[in-house]
A protein has these predicted regions:
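Active-site-proximal loop/turn and secondary-structure-junction residues that shape catalytic pockets
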Residues: 6-8, 66-68, 105-107
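A solvent-exposed, charged loop/short amphipathic helix patch at secondary-structure junctions
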Residues: 12-37
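Extracellular serine-dependent O-acyl
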Residues: 59-61, 82-114, 136, 150-152
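Active-site segments of SGNH/GDSL-like serine hydrolases
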Residues: 49-78, 111, 153-163
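Conserved catalytic region of serine esterases and O-acyltransferases that act on ester linkages
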Residues: 120, 136-208
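Secondary-structure boundary elements
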Residues: 10, 41-60, 93-98
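Acidic, His- and aromatic-enriched active-site or binding-groove loops in soluble protein domains
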Residues: 23-32, 80-93, 124-126
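Short, solvent-exposed beta-strand-terminating loops
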Residues: 2-16
């Protein structure tokens, strides 16, 4: 899964190379510019072609971050996001069986317009928005079985986070035993799940 955030890049003036980090060097050492759709597509075409040659079954899911970059203003942000959306659309045309898109950007901007879906800075999604996006994502890509496994894993995670008032009590010891049984049942159905740390912690708490 790859998330595009911005189509703006920094280039070293001396070399013309795009940098991933300015390393606290003076801003005057760099040019900041908007990449074109063709530039991004060309880079990712060679990358995806190489990856799928090694793994023909590879599926790549793209998203565009709904967080707005307003340094250059709202219009420049829209130009950047539009460039990214057009890039992904082109990549889907080039790799229709390998490249897919999840519309996180559109969901936040078109469906979640209320203030409660944004943090105090009015740029970042609120926890409520994140949960909504996660539900949309899981409904789109997860099978019913996967959702059930996630529910059971989350149930165990919440149990493990429980902080007892009386850790030596018989009731808490039974509670720990129930967690171990839940883990054993889940591993019995899905042996690839790793609950070693949780199991060890339960046994430590059972035998202080």
């Amino acid at each position: 899964m790859l998330t595009f955030g911005t189509a703006y890049v920094y280039e070293q003036k001396e070399t013309g190379r795009v940098v991933s980090n300015c390393h606290k060097l003076p801003e005057s050492n760099f040019n900041r510019r908007l990449l074109s759709v063709d530039e991004i597509v060309n880079e990712y075409t060679s990358l995806i072609a190489g990856m799928t040659a090694r793994n023909p079954n590879l599926k790549i899911l793209f998203t565009v971050s709904p967080i707005r970059h307003i340094r250059d203003g709202m219009h420049a942000n829209q130009l950047s996001k539009s460039t990214l959306l057009l890039t992904i659309d082109r990549l889907q045309q080039l790799f229709p069986k390998q490249v897919f898109y999840f519309p996180a950007y559109e969901i936040v901007l078109d469906e979640l317009r209320d203030y409660r879906f944004y943090a105090d800075d009015m740029l970042h999604p609120s926890p409520l928005a994140v949960n909504y996006l996660w539900k949309c994502f899981s409904d789109s890509f997860f099978s019913a079985e996967t959702k059930q496994v996630m529910t059971e894993v989350e149930d165990i995670r919440k149990d493990m986070a429980h902080k007892p008032f009386h850790p030596e009590s018989e009731a808490y010891q039974r509670f720990l035993g129930q967690i171990v049984l839940k883990i054993e049942r889940l591993i019995g159905k899905y042996p690839y799940l790793d609950f070693q740390k949780e199991t060890e912690l339960c046994h430590i708490r059972l035998n202080p």
